[in-house]
């Protein structure tokens, strides 16, 4: 999709696809409901990748958030979109994806940033396990900085200072099943 216009899939309130719109124009003060995905990426040691959104981002610039978010292209599965964005946005090796599982299948949210731009998404939340290493080389226009952290440290930080993190990350981590899935992902006793 490097030379093509990136499209997002629009949705109705029931979660049906109803068309497409250019990603470059869809996020406004009157953003239509559309499909997205959110992912939490773990390395083989069970550390969670957290990213700080680039300062040039249209929404929530400079805010810490989960590993990666994005939009599936028309006729693309979320798992394929996660692989595509993981390679293009984070510089992950395509072969490093061990497992992608949906944890919050029916997650959706609406949030408005300080500039009035709205995110309104049907956004299943995924847990991604990497088979090897943690080499990340993110695109500077997507990610300002990143860190691999122990999941419990991330949970504690989100609980103590939610204003430092994206509203979707704070809301997603309010679901105990997501926290449990992250903690158990590489736990041999789980």
From Swiss-Prot:
It catalyses: isopentenyl diphosphate = dimethylallyl diphosphate. The active site is at residues 69, 121. It is found in: Cytoplasm. GO terms for molecular function: isopentenyl-diphosphate delta-isomerase activity; metal ion binding. Mg(2+) binds at residues 69, 89. Mn(2+) binds at residues 27, 34, 71, 119, 121. GO terms for biological process: dimethylallyl diphosphate biosynthetic process; isoprenoid biosynthetic process. It comes from the Bacteria. One of its GO terms (cellular component) is cytoplasm. InterPro entries: Idi_bact, IsopentenylPP_isomerase_typ1, NUDIX_hydrolase-like_dom_sf, NUDIX_hydrolase_dom. Its main location: cytoplasm. Pathway: Isoprenoid biosynthesis; dimethylallyl diphosphate biosynthesis; dimethylallyl diphosphate from isopentenyl diphosphate: step 1/1. Belongs to the IPP isomerase type 1 family. This is Isopentenyl-diphosphate Delta-isomerase. It comes from Corynebacterium efficiens (strain DSM 44549 / YS-314 / AJ 12310 / JCM 11189 / NBRC 100395). The lineage of its organism: Bacteria, Bacillati, Actinomycetota, Actinomycetes, Mycobacteriales.
């Amino acid at each position: 999709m490097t030379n093509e216009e990136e499209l997002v899939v629009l949705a109705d309130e029931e979660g049906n696809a109803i068309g497409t719109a250019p990603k470059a124009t869809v996020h406004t003060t009157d953003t239509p409901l559309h499909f997205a995905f959110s992912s939490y990426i773990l390395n083989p040691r069970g550390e969670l990748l957290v990213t700080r959104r680039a300062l040039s981002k249209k929404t929530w610039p400079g805010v810490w958030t989960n590993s990666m978010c994005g939009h599936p292209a028309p006729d693309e599965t979320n798992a394929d979109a996660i692989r595509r964005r993981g390679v293009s946005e984070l510089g992950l090796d395509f072969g490093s994806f061990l497992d992608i599982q949906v944890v919050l299948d029916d997650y959706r949210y609406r949030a408005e940033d300080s500039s009035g731009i709205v995110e309104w998404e049907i956004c299943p939340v995924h847990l991604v396990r990497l088979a090897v290493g943690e080499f990340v080389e993110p695109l500077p226009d997507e990610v300002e900085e990143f860190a691999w952290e122990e999941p419990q440290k991330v949970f504690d930080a989100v609980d103590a200072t939610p204003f430092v993190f994206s509203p979707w990350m704070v809301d997603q981590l309010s679901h105990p099943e997501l926290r449990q899935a992250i903690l158990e992902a590489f736990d041999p006793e789980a």
